[in-house]
Design a protein with these regions (language model features):
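Active-site SXXK
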Residues: 1-10, 31, 153
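Extracytoplasmic
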Residues: 5-7, 23, 38, 56, ...
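Acidic helix-start/capping segments at beta-turn-to-alpha-helix junctions
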Residues: 8-21, 30
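Tryptophan-centric aromatic hotspots in well-structured domains and transmembrane helices
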Residues: 12-13, 74, 139
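Mid-domain, small-residue-enriched loop/turn segments at the edges of structured enzyme/sensor domains
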Residues: 20-24, 28, 40-95
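Structured C-terminal helix/loop/strand segments within mature extracytoplasmic catalytic/sensor domains
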Residues: 45-50, 91-183
Length: 183
């Protein structure tokens, strides 16, 4: 692989980015926490379009469609996935039905862990689709593990503006609280 649990650091090249958190060296945890596109684009670039496509096919990620530009397929809306497909994929990832390296799965789970209490663990990842400076597509996917169950979710909000991953997170958190799954 391009990165390993022990070696996931990448050096920022000094380019200006829209978010200050992107203008720093990154590792898997910081890149996941801040959705640092350049970090994941660098991995994709090193993998190449064929290996990226093979992986999307292996994990049956949505429509498995990539544009020919590795820098854009996440943001040009050629790659599409439904909330139900997100939940199915996340459950298969969490139970390692894809037969990935256990340490890599563990590293990703650690990178998306939001909170831990004696009652369980809360995992999730936000995402925001921005077009022409407007946040039009907000995602929050994740799961809660308790001693006796796992609860998977995917929240997607769409609007002409202000549809962010943060808002999807807030909606999901309210629902989980009302259902007494996570406080």
């Amino acid at each position: 692989g391009i990165i390993t649990p022990e070696h996931s650091s990448m050096t920022w090249n000094g380019d200006a980015f829209p978010f200050p958190s992107w203008e720093a060296d990154q590792d898997l945890n910081s890149a996941m926490q801040n959705s640092v596109n350049w970090y994941f684009q660098a991995i994709d670039s090193q993998l190449g379009i064929n290996r990226v496509q093979e992986f999307l096919n292996k994990i049956e990620y949505g429509n498995q469609t990539t544009s020919s530009n590795l820098d854009l397929y996440w943001s040009d809306f050629s790659l599409k996935i439904s909330p139900l497909e997100q939940v199915t994929l996340l459950k298969k990832f969490n139970t390692n039905e894809f037969h990935l390296n256990f340490q890599n799965v563990f590293s990703v789970k650690n990178a998306i862990k939001i909170a831990s209490t004696p009652n369980g663990n809360f995992y999730g990842k936000t995402g925001t689709g921005r077009v022409n400076g407007q946040d039009i597509n907000g995602w929050f996917i994740g799961y809660v593990e308790t001693s006796d169950n796992s609860y998977y979710f995917a929240t997607n909000i769409q609007s002409d503006s202000n549809a962010t991953g943060k808002k999807a997170f807030e909606i999901t958190s309210d629902i989980l609280k009302k259902l007494h799954i996570w406080n």
